[in-house]
Amino acid sequence: MKAVIYHAFSHKEAKDHDVQELGTQRAEAFVRAFLKQSIPHMSQQDCESHLQRKAVILEYFTRLKPKPRPKKKSKGLSAKQRRELRLFDIKPEQQRYSLFLPLHELWKQYIRDLCNGLKPDTQPQMIQAKLLKADLHGAVISVTKSKCPSYVGVTGILLQETKHVFKIITKEDHLKVIPKQNCVFTIEIDDFISYIYGSKFQLRASERSAKKFKAKGTIDL
C-alpha cells in the first residue's frame, strides 16, 4: 500500500505530465504535508495509521444450502384406505328404494337445469351429449341389452358409479352390481330416452366431464 502511495513518476511520466521528478523521500514528505493541510484535525498517529493500512483478505465463505423441508403428509384417508375400511359400502338397513326417491327427484331437476328445460322441441342429440357428461347418481337406469340374460330388465336408482360397474337399488330393495362391459343401459326423463353403451362408458364419473364422445352409427356389445 505504501509503495503505491509513494510511487514516484518515471522519467517518461514526469515528462508527459510536465512535473518535476521527485525521489521517494521527497514524495513521502509531500504526501504527509498534503494530508496535514487537507485534514488538520487528524493527529499524526492517525495519519501514520492510514498510510500504513493494508488490505485484509477474508476467508472464502460457502453459503449453506437450506435443508429441504419434509413434505406434509395428507391428513385425509387415501382411496385404498377408504376401500379397506369399506366406507363406500351401503349398509343393509339403508338398502331401501324409498330412501333414495328424494335423490332421484334432485337428479331430475339437475338434468332439467343442465339442459335448459326439457321441452318437446329440444334436440335429442343435445340431451344425449349432456347426459354423457352429467353426474348420473340418482338416475333411474335400466339394462336393455346384455350378454348376460339375467341382467336384462334390471331397473333401479343409480347409487354408485365406478369405472367398471353401476350399483343400483331396485324397487324390491335389492342392491344390484351391474358391469358396464357388454351391457346397454337406458335412462328416461320427461319422455326422453337416452342409451348408454357400457363398453364405451368405462370411465369414472369425474373423468367423463372432460371426455369427448364420438357419435357412431352402430356399436356391438
Swiss-Prot record:
The Gene Ontology CC terms held by the record are: multimeric ribonuclease P complex; nucleolus; ribonuclease MRP complex; ribonuclease P complex
Q: Which residues carry this modification: Phosphoserine?
A: S10
Q: Which Pfam families match?
A: RNase_P-MRP_p29
Q: What keywords sit in the KW lines?
A: Nucleus, Phosphoprotein, tRNA processing
Q: Name one GO molecular function term.
A: ribonuclease P RNA binding
This protein's major location comes to nucleus
The cellular location(s) given in this protein's UniProt record come to: Nucleus, Nucleolus
Cysteine pairs forming cystine bridges in this chain are none
> Record's InterPro entries?
RNase_P/MRP_Rpp29-subunit, RNase_P/MRP_Rpp29_sf, Rof/RNase_P-like, Rpp29/RNP1
What Gene3D superfamilies does the annotation carry?
Answer: Ribonuclease P/MRP, subunit p29
Q: Name one GO biological process term.
A: rRNA processing
| General function of this protein | Component of ribonuclease P, a ribonucleoprotein complex that generates mature tRNA molecules by cleaving their 5'-ends.
Q: How does it assemble?
A: Component of nuclear RNase P and RNase MRP ribonucleoproteins. RNase P consists of a catalytic RNA moiety and 10 different protein chains; POP1, POP4, POP5, POP7, RPP14, RPP21, RPP25, RPP30, RPP38 and RPP40. Within the RNase P complex, POP1, POP7 and RPP25 form the 'finger' subcomplex, POP5, RPP14, RPP40 and homodimeric RPP30 form the 'palm' subcomplex, and RPP21, POP4 and RPP38 form the 'wrist' subcomplex. All subunits of the RNase P complex interact with the catalytic RNA. Several subunits of RNase P are also part of the RNase MRP complex.
The family annotation for this protein states:
Belongs to the eukaryotic/archaeal RNase P protein component 1 family.
Known PANTHER family for this protein? RIBONUCLEASE P PROTEIN SUBUNIT P29, RIBONUCLEASE P SUBUNIT P29
> What's the protein name?
Ribonuclease P protein subunit p29
